[in-house]
């Protein structure tokens, strides 16, 4: 499933005024809709904003168990290409540096977390695009679990709600998400770090777009007249606390970036 999902180009676009920000996200969202219908899930739908939801009904006798939700986003970061992805499978990782292509190497010294995956099967890119594991790995996990539960009705569980959203990477993922309609008592986003981790709090951020209009004057006549927009922005950036940057903060410490 994962390799199938990453073949879809689902980059979001922070400069778009539409929702979803790119129409190509809807291609994967509709694919997931059809897949859930084939599995036999109930209440499967896509709304006007592209949110896809579905239900695995509760087992007999478990109707009063709290409803659990699982959510993932379909979009990938606009910072790097998501087109023509070429995944490569490393069957048994040897714990050494991974050469993605002739020019790019994932060094264990730069990514020490690789040491935890020696002997595991890894999926990497050819270094020219994103892989899209954020968050198509989460989608694959949810859909695989859903298929398993639908195929094994002997496993007792309460009502399970599934949701797939667009535009998370550009900070708009839940802009129109109807929490009440989703109807979960508890919900988990399958978009995280190491196996076994459970994050019970979330990161919040706000962004600002600042434009400076300079004044261009011939350098020979510029005294007290020229305004260099780059210098103004540089001065503004210098006013931000130097110790409150991502490279100097951790935990609950906020930062400017």
Q: Predicted regions: what is each one?
A:
Residues 32, 141-149, 233-237:
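Buried hydrophobic packing segments
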Residues 98, 105, 114, 120-133, ...:
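Midchain, well-structured core segments that form catalytic/ion-binding scaffolds
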Residues 28, 134-141, 229-232:
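Catalytic-loop motifs flanking and including active-site residues across diverse enzymes
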Residues 1-23, 124:
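N-terminal capping segment at the start of a domain
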Residues 17-65, 69-71, 75:
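A non-catalytic alpha/beta surface segment that caps or lines the substrate-entry region
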Residues 56, 79-84, 173-174:
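Short, conserved acidic/polar surface loops in the N-terminal third of protein domains
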Residues 51-55, 159-176:
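Beta-rich nucleic-acid/ligand-interaction surfaces
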Residues 63-159, 164:
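Active-site metal-coordination/substrate-binding segment of hydrolases
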């Amino acid at each position: 499933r994962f390799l199938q999902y990453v073949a879809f180009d689902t980059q979001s676009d922070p400069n778009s005024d539409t929702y979803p920000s790119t129409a190509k996200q809807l291609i994967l969202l509709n694919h997931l809709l059809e897949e859930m219908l084939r599995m036999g899930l109930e209440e499967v739908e896509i709304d006007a904003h592209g949110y896809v939801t579905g239900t695995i009904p509760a087992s007999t006798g478990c109707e009063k168990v709290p409803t659990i939700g699982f959510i993932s986003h379909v979009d990938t970061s606009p910072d790097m290409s998501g087109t023509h992805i070429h995944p490569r499978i490393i069957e048994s990782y040897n714990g050494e540096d991974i050469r993605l292509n002739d020019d790019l190497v994932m060094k264990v010294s730069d990514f020490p977390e690789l040491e935890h995956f020696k002997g595991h099967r890894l999926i990497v890119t050819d270094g020219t695009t994103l892989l899209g594991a954020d968050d198509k790995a989460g989608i694959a996990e949810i859909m695989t679990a859903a298929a398993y539960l639908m195929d094994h009705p002997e496993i007792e569980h309460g009502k399970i709600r599934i949701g797939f959203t667009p535009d998370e990477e550009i900070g708009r993922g839940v802009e129109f998400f109807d929490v009440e309609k989703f109807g979960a008592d508890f919900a988990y986003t399958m978009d995280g770090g190491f196996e076994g981790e459970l994050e019970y709090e979330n990161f919040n951020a706000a962004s600002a777009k600042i434009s400076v209009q300079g004044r261009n004057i011939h350098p020979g006549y510029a005294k007290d007249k020229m305004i260099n927009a780059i210098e103004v922005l540089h001065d503004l950036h210098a006013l931000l606390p130097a110790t409150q940057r991502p490279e100097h903060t951790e935990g609950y410490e906020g930062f400017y970036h």
